[in-house]
């Protein structure tokens, strides 16, 4: 009977059912990831569930796309799931570079909270798909909004990795040798082997996480830059103005300046250690305000609507 109802709902309400499945799989994944931290060993089960979550969100968004007829990122419900899709993808890519149990243990709670907010906090009318106004029926919707959302995901991953660096070193001095260019470190080889005159520097756990944080933020910054440029071009085509300084545009520009300052200090000043990690961690709040803050105001072209009311 339960299975019959499940499959019946899956047929008639696939978006909602898949959204709930994502929530429950993340809920299962959370204690497993925390247990892996205490065991100090990466968990293949966590990675498999994360892959499943990513695939379920992909399927959910494809269903919504098929039902609505437009790219599924036009309201807050869709964008929250798209953001979660981006964070899970970023988590898997980071783990591919460096497997450490702390990586999923910091990413999964954010993914779970994001999905829980979409499932249980958003009013029902903000979950429904609606027809787009003529100005939004453009290929720029896919280019601009998806790139900006992926930039948020990458910046959030970078901030969370910096938080993990601070957490690991909370009771001791933080010394980082990781490369600010994100390409690793090398030194001259003492043995001068025939085929190679350099050998890699072995980075510590914190240094690996710091480098991955830097790389994630760099990717997020590039994507945010592309998102701002594409948004300006789209705005000029649709409304005849490149920039209108509405709340979302203003905060997006503030976010861009924030991360530009971080990258400038890392690259030109060789800034290492606790200070850049603190700054990158603070970036999480900047992205949060940029993404959700405008919806508490309920104004501007970029607002998805008033959340509580």
Curated annotation (Swiss-Prot):
Keywords, alphabetical: Cytochrome c-type biogenesis, Membrane, Thylakoid, Transmembrane, Transmembrane helix
Transmembrane region(s): 18-38, 48-68, 73-93, 102-122, 148-168, 216-236, 250-267, 279-299
UniProt-listed GO biological process terms: cytochrome complex assembly
Membrane topology qualifier: Multi-pass membrane protein
GO molecular function, one term: heme binding
NCBIfam families xrefs: cytochr_II_ccsB
Function field: Required during biogenesis of c-type cytochromes (cytochrome c6 and cytochrome f) at the step of heme attachment.
Name the UniProt record assigns to this protein: Cytochrome c biogenesis protein CcsA
Native organism: Prochlorococcus marinus (strain AS9601)
Gene name of the encoded protein: ccsA
